[in-house]
Every structure is written in structure tokens, then in C-alpha cells.
Regions:
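Non-catalytic, solvent-exposed segments at the cell envelope interface
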Residues: 1-276
Length: 276
């Protein structure tokens, strides 16, 4: 799943960085879904031994290059994808009637700030949340609000709290989990409406008929575990502020343990070379 900061709603998706990169692993036997966010500033081989931030691969070669980057650096075999923008996400959430969210004071402040731009880009309205009295710990999650599409999308954009981009990606995975859970309880008629409303806003490797055939099975699946990649890293100023896996080899081993319950995975020669 790629998320694009796509400002011009009248042009096709492409040419922008994918500031959201989420890998979904679906186990059709257990009906379990695992999600892994690849941090956008992760230093990876984007192709031809060009090392840069992972989010730049989409801008260089759209989904094809971004998927190749993931497959070659992480020893994966991803073949399907979907790319969404702010408008698609706000529409999904509004069609579901919004989301109930527990938040910190800091998250409320930043969400309200992001809402201004998100509303302008999507053409959708929102009501700013009135700030409570400032607590001693502004990072403590202690407030509960019902968010509409603009607000929940803005919540997904927050990256200026103490948890930085790790917190941003965790919020995104949390919202996806909430969307899946609410869609399952909403029923097929709502799911099909969302499909009709959102599909024109999505770029995907799958056709609409294929997706429609899959939707009835959604109710049986659950997103049960999520994490971020890399799990072990350091910050560096190589080619800008980047996240450097320490090392790529060990992180790929941990990734395969998480995604596939494989405790004895041996990374490929390509991963070993990229890990140097």
C-alpha cells in the first residue's frame, strides 16, 4: 500500500514520493493479516546501486520501481499494490461514519494544524477540536474524540510528536486496523459503496471486478499484528537525514520472522550485498 501526498486531484497519481509504504502479509489459512510500515527515510538501494530514502523510489519509477526496491532489499515477492491519496482515505472514513480515536494533547494540536491543509486538498469540511487544558504530559493518550475523514487523515500525517516518523506510521496502521474492523461490522452494502466511491481515486494492479469478488471474504480476516521496518536502526545525515538499518541483513531476518514466522531465514546474496 502506497500513500501519496498528491496535491493536484485532476492528474493521475505518480511522480511523487510515497511517504506511506505499508506491506501487507495475508495468511489465507489463518485469516490473519500482518502490516509492516517501511519508514519513509530508510536508506535503501533504489536500483542500480543508487542509495537514497525509500520514499523516493516511487517518484523515480512509480509503483514498479518502489515494489522492485522492496522485493530486492527485503527478499520479498510483492506483486500487487494499491496507491491512494488524501482524498481516497478521507472518503473511506467518511463513508464509514468516522472513527473513534484516543489521542494525546500533542496529537490534538498537530491534527488541528494538518486539518487546514487536508481540508483544502480534499475539499471536505471539518470542525477543529477545542483544545483541553494543557496537561503536564502532553504525550499522554487520555482524550477521546470522534473524527471525520479530514481529521482522521490529518491524524495519520502527524510526525512532530516525540515518536517522530515511528509514531506517524504507527498511527497509520492503527487507522487501517480501525477501518477494517468498522468495515466488517458495517456490512457488504457499505463496503460496496466505498468501493464505488474510492476506486476512481486509487491506482492499483488489480481490476475492479477482481476486488469486488474478494470483498465478501473480508469479513473473515483480521489485522492482528503490525510493526515498522527497520526494527533496528540509527539516524544519519548521509544524503539528508536518513534511517540506516543496523544491519540490513539482521533486519531482513527479523522481518521474515515477523511476516512468516520463520525464525531461521537466511537472507539472499542481494540483501547481503546491500547490507555492506
Amino acid at each position: 500500500l502506497f500513500g501519496i501526498d498528491h496535491r493536484d486531484k485532476n492528474t493521475a497519481l505518480g511522480g511523487e514520493n510515497s511517504d506511506t509504504i505499508i506491506i501487507a502479509s495475508v495468511n489465507n489459512d489463518t485469516k490473519d493479516v500482518k502490516l509492516v510500515s517501511v519508514y519513509r527515510d530508510t536508506l535503501l538501494n533504489l536500483g542500480n546501486d543508487t542509495y537514497s530514502k525509500a520514499n523516493a523510489a516511487y517518484a523515480y519509477g512509480e509503483a514498479e520501481q518502489a515494489i522492485t526496491m522492496l522485493n530486492t532489499n527485503l527478499d520479498l515477492n510483492i506483486s500487487e499494490y494499491a496507491t491512494v491519496n488524501f482524498n481516497a482515505l478521507t472518503t473511506i472514513i467518511d463513508d464509514l461514519g468516522g472513527l473513534d480515536m484516543d489521542m494525546s494533547y500533542a496529537e490534538i494540536v498537530h491534527m488541528n494544524n494538518y486539518c487546514v491543509e487536508t481540508s483544502e486538498e480534499t475539499g471536505k469540511d471539518y470542525t477543529p477540536i477545542e483544545l483541553p487544558d494543557r496537561p503536564d504530559d502532553i504525550e499522554a493518550v487520555q482524550y477521546h474524540y470522534h473524527l471525520n475523514g479530514v481529521q482522521a487523515t490529518s491524524y495519520c500525517r502527524i510526525r512532530y510528536t516525540a515518536s517522530l516518523d515511528m509514531g506517524r506510521t504507527e498511527r497509520q496502521r492503527k487507522v487501517i486496523q480501525m477501518i477494517v474492523d468498522k468495515a466488517k461490522s458495517a456490512g457488504l452494502s457499505t463496503i460496496f459503496k466505498i468501493m464505488d466511491d474510492v476506486f476512481p481515486m486509487v491506482t492499483t494492479s488489480m481490476d475492479k471486478t477482481e476486488i469486488l469478488q474478494m470483498l465478501p471474504t473480508l469479513i473473515g480476516y483480521s489485522v492482528n499484528d503490525t510493526t515498522g521496518f527497520p526494527s533496528s536502526f540509527k539516524f544519519s545525515n548521509v544524503k539528508g537525514s536518513v534511517i540506516v538499518p543496523t544491519s540490513l541483513e539482521s533486519n531482513v531476518i527479523e522481518l521474515h520472522k515477523f511476516l512468516y514466522d520463520d525464525p531461521n531465514y537466511t537472507p539472499s546474496a542481494t540483501v547481503l550485498a546491500n547490507s555492506q
